[in-house]
């Protein structure tokens, strides 16, 4: 994949604190408090999903910042109060608070803010306007949809015009699984398919994905959420090798 050397590849897993990774990734005897530092030796980014359930404290973000290398980047998933409960209605204050804590805590290591919408959140003009009017274009905002109605030309055009990233995904459903490349950064989530969170992708599938990234792309964030067992670790390392990423 030497043709993609100019791309800033950010490859990692959706989280790091998995007890089943003990002995298969984390060395025996390594204290759990040192797991994140060990993770950072192997990957240059992480997608934090625990923030979906409870927003981490500023102290947690500061700790992650201090424990990670200078060029490490974080993606933080927005709380479900914004995306699943309120569905962006009456959420301006919540979004501002979310932005504030991740910017303050992660500073120059903040990669993306991820907003994952539920399958019940289908496309309407009103909902598209809610997204466009509530997101701060000064940040790298990534939206992951789970309803196929969002794959339409109007959405793609508005996202491009407003510097929003439409997340590609591999998910056990009928949703399209191609990469969506009209704004930098490109963002893709491997959730496990056909078995959610579990299935290992073949090396050929990883090669096909890497080759799909168009020349001229500046930055790509790729996260493996098939974190059951070794699947995410194996696939992430395969992609790192394919992209000649030196860690």
Task: Label each region the model flagged.
Residues 1-247:
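Residues lining hydrophobic/aromatic ligand-binding pockets adjacent to catalytic sites
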């Amino acid at each position: 994949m030497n043709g993609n050397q100019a791309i800033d590849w950010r490859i990692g897993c959706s989280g790091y604190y998995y007890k089943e990774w003990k002995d298969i990734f984390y060395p025996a005897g390594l204290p759990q408090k040192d797991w994140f530092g060990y993770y950072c030796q192997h990957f240059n980014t992480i997608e934090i999903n625990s923030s979906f359930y409870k927003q981490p404290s500023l102290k947690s973000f500061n700790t992650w910042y201090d424990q990670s290398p200078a060029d490490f980047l974080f993606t933080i998933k927005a709380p479900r109060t914004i995306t699943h409960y309120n569905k962006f209605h009456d959420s301006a204050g919540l979004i501002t608070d979310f932005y504030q804590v991740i910017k303050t805590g992660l500073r120059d290591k903040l990669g993306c803010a991820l907003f994952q919408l539920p399958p019940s959140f289908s496309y309407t003009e009103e909902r598209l306007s809610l997204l466009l009017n509530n997101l701060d274009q000064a940040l790298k905002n990534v939206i992951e949809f789970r309803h196929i109605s969002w794959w339409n030309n109007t959405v793609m055009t508005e996202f491009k015009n407003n510097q929003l990233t439409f997340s590609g995904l591999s998910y056990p459903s009928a949703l399209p699984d191609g990469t969506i490349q009209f704004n930098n950064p490109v963002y893709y989530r491997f959730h496990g398919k056909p078995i959610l969170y579990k299935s290992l992708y073949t090396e050929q599938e990883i090669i096909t994905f890497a080759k799909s990234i168009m020349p001229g792309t500046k930055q790509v964030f790729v996260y493996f959420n098939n974190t059951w067992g070794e699947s995410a670790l194996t696939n992430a390392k395969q992609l790192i090798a394919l992209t000649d990423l030196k860690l």
